[in-house]
């Protein structure tokens, strides 16, 4: 049976997924709760990793070691970093990387890779589902760091250096982990704010709306994969 893993950082990012999946088995391993459901002949596992890269990497590796998924989807909300991307649009990662670490340390030392590519089939599936739902979507780079970006000045610096479509706090870590484990991966994020001076206010207003939208997209992806 095919196994699909879904990882989100916050309970709000997984609440709708869990409600739509219904009651299933829950296993607690290494401090993480893994929700396990059978859906359309596939095993779908979801976990709330907690915020930031260390939590995301730990949860991803524990999930891989214990459940051996065929692919990993990182879901949730993110800040928009490209002027074309609006609140409630979807960004599908083409690649992920940290914005708060000199990539020299990743490229010139293990794992000898600083930019982690997303899987083509997963990207295509996410884009197809967005089209089915009539949701505006973009493929592009997602960057991650250890802070919620809500400053015009910080946003501009990240834009100039990395030219990303979205910023979050976990995608790069999940992608890094999947790269090391040779697993197909994609991050599918719904924009909750523009990562600017108004970011915190926008996040509070659109968090639940954005989380529900991306949850519906990710669950539809599991049906097509």
Region locations from a protein language model:
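N-terminal short beta-loop-beta anion/metal-coordinating cradle
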Residues: 1-67
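Generic non-transmembrane alpha-helical segments
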Residues: 20, 121-134, 161, 177, ...
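Alpha-helix C-terminal capping segments
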Residues: 62-66, 80, 84-85, 176-184
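Proline-aspartate-enriched helix->loop->beta-strand connector
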Residues: 68-73
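A C-terminal functional module that forms or caps the active site or interfaces directly
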Residues: 148-195, 200
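His/Asp/Glu-rich mid-to-C-terminal helical/loop segments that flank catalytic regions of hydrolases
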Residues: 195-225
